[in-house]
Design a protein with these regions (language model features):
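Acidic, metal/ion-coordinating pockets
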Residues: 1-150, 157, 188-200, 210, ...
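Basic, gly/Ser/Thr/Pro-rich low-complexity segments located predominantly at protein N termini
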Residues: 9-15, 98-99, 140, 168-175, ...
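Generic signal for short, ordered secondary-structure residues
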Residues: 14, 21, 70, 180, ...
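Feature captures C-terminal
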Residues: 104-112, 122, 195-371
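Hard-cation-handling environments
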Residues: 137-141, 145-226, 232
Length: 371
C-alpha cells in the first residue's frame, strides 16, 4: 500500500504563531487550494491520501483541556477543508489541540477528520480497509487512547540520549528556586504561574507593567526545587525582553484585545482590571487601575513584553505602535536572574483580572441552592 502525506499550515497560524522576522520573504497561499493541487498531482501514484494540518485556532497551553470545555478551540478550518477537497481520505489536525473521541466523517465528501487534544496526552487510532485494485478507502473505526505517561517505564534509549546531553550541559540541573506548591497554567484566566512570570519581568525591566501571552507559558512548575532546565521548559523561546512606551488609551486597547481571548488571556503585572466576558468584544473592560490608581489615557507608561509580542505576535498589533525603550536582554536571562535573586518563591495571589460575569454566576448558584 502506498500512502501519500501532505502537510499544510493555515493562514491564521502562519501570521499569528510565527514572529514577523521569521516570515520575511515568505507568502502563504490558500491551504485548501494548495492541498487540492498536490492531491491531484499524486492521486494516481498512491492508494490513500492523508493531510496533516496545522490550522484552526491556536491551542491552549493547558494539559487538562479535555476536561475544560472553555478552552477547547474547535476544528472549523479542518471541517471546511474536508468539505471542499476531492480525493483526500483523512485529515489529521493539529495546532488547535482540539480532540475528537471518535473521528468525524464529512457528509459531503466522506473525508475522515481526527484530532487528539495534543501535547502527547492521547494517541489516535484509526483503522481503514483499502482496495488496492480500485481506488477505494473505507473507514472502519477510530478512537483515542489515553497516554498515562507516569505509569509507563522510561524508554532506555531516549533516557540515555537526554542524560548524555545533561552531562554536556550540567548547568541545566542548577537549582534556581523553590516553590511550596504547584504553579499551574490557565489559558483563559489569570494564573499563578502567569502572575509570577510577569512580576519577575516587571521587576527585571523596572517597568510600570508587564504583559505575557498565555500561549508562551509551555509548562507548569511542580512543587519543590526549580531547575534551569525547568525554567527553559516553561519559557523555551529565544527572544529579548522588550520594554515599550504606550499611552493609557493604548494599554486599554491592549487589554481589550486580550479579553477577546483570541490566543488566551494575557497575563499581567502592575494592573488590576475588572471586565465582563458577556459583553461585545473590545467593549468588555469595566475598570483598569495601575498600582491602585486610575490609568490615565494620555499618560505614558512602560510595558515589558517578549520580543515575539513586541513584533505583533498573536495579533497584538497595538504593541508595534509604541516606542521601544529597550530590548537588549534575553527574556530567559531576565527570568533566570530574578529566580536566582528570590530563591524561595512566594505564591502570587489571584485577583488581578476579575470577570464580573463569573461573580454573577457564583451569586446565582448560591441564591438557588437548597441550604
Amino acid at each position: 500500500i502506498k500512502v501519500g502525506v501532505i502537510g499544510v499550515m493555515g493562514i491564521d497560524a502562519f501570521y499569528n504563531t510565527m514572529a514577523s522576522f521569521h516570515r520575511t520573504g515568505l507568502t502563504i497561499k490558500d491551504p485548501t487550494e494548495t492541498v487540492q493541487y498536490w492531491a491531484d498531482k499524486i492521486r494516481d501514484d498512491v492508494n490513500m491520501i492523508i493531510v496533516l494540518t496545522h490550522q484552526n485556532k491556536t491551542a491552549p497551553m493547558q494539559t487538562n483541556k479535555e476536561s475544560d470545555p472553555s478552552v477547547q478551540r474547535g476544528f472549523d478550518e479542518d471541517y471546511a477543508m474536508a468539505g471542499n477537497l476531492k480525493g483526500v481520505d483523512v485529515i489529521f489536525g493539529g495546532h488547535s489541540d482540539n480532540g475528537l473521541q471518535t473521528p468525524v466523517i464529512h457528509p459531503k465528501t466522506g473525508t475522515v477528520i481526527g484530532l487528539t487534544f495534543g501535547q502527547g496526552m492521547h494517541l489516535g487510532y484509526t483503522k481503514f480497509q483499502i482496495d488496492t485494485q480500485k481506488y477505494d478507502v473505507e473507514f472502519i473505526e477510530g478512537f483515542l487512547i489515553p497516554v498515562n505517561s507516569n505509569e509507563l517505564p522510561e524508554d532506555k534509549e531516549t533516557s540515555t540520549l537526554i542524560n548524555n546531553y545533561r552531562k554536556v550541559f550540567p548547568e541545566l540541573l542548577e537549582v534556581i528556586g523553590n516553590v511550596s506548591e504547584p504553579l499551574m497554567r490557565k489559558y483563559n484566566k489569570e494564573s499563578t504561574i502567569g502572575n509570577l512570570l510577569t512580576d519577575y519581568i516587571k521587576e527585571a525591566a523596572g517597568s510600570d507593567i508587564a504583559f505575557l501571552n498565555s500561549g508562551a507559558i509551555r509548562a507548569d512548575f511542580n512543587a519543590g526545587d526549580i531547575t534551569l532546565e525547568q525554567l527553559i521548559n516553561v519559557y523555551p523561546f529565544k527572544d529579548n525582553l522588550t520594554t515599550i512606551e504606550l499611552s493609557g488609551s493604548q494599554i486599554k486597547e491592549l487589554i481589550e484585545y486580550s479579553l477577546t481571548l483570541p490566543y488566551g488571556i494575557g497575563q499581567i503585572s502592575g494592573l488590576e482590571i475588572k471586565y465582563d466576558s458577556l459583553q461585545d468584544e473590545m467593549n468588555r473592560l469595566i475598570e483598569i487601575k495601575i498600582n491602585g490608581s486610575d490609568l490615565i489615557d494620555i499618560k505614558k507608561y512602560s510595558v515589558s513584553v517578549s520580543g515575539y509580542l513586541a513584533n505583533g505576535g498573536d495579533g497584538y498589533q497595538i504593541l508595534t505602535k509604541g516606542r521601544v525603550l529597550s530590548n537588549d536582554k534575553p527574556f530567559q536571562d531576565a527570568l533566570y536572574d530574578e529566580f536566582k535573586k528570590v530563591k524561595t518563591i512566594q505564591i502570587p495571589t489571584l485577583g488581578r483580572q476579575i470577570n464580573v460575569s463569573d461573580l454573577t454566576k457564583t451569586s446565582n448558584l448560591f441564591s438557588h441552592s437548597d441550604f
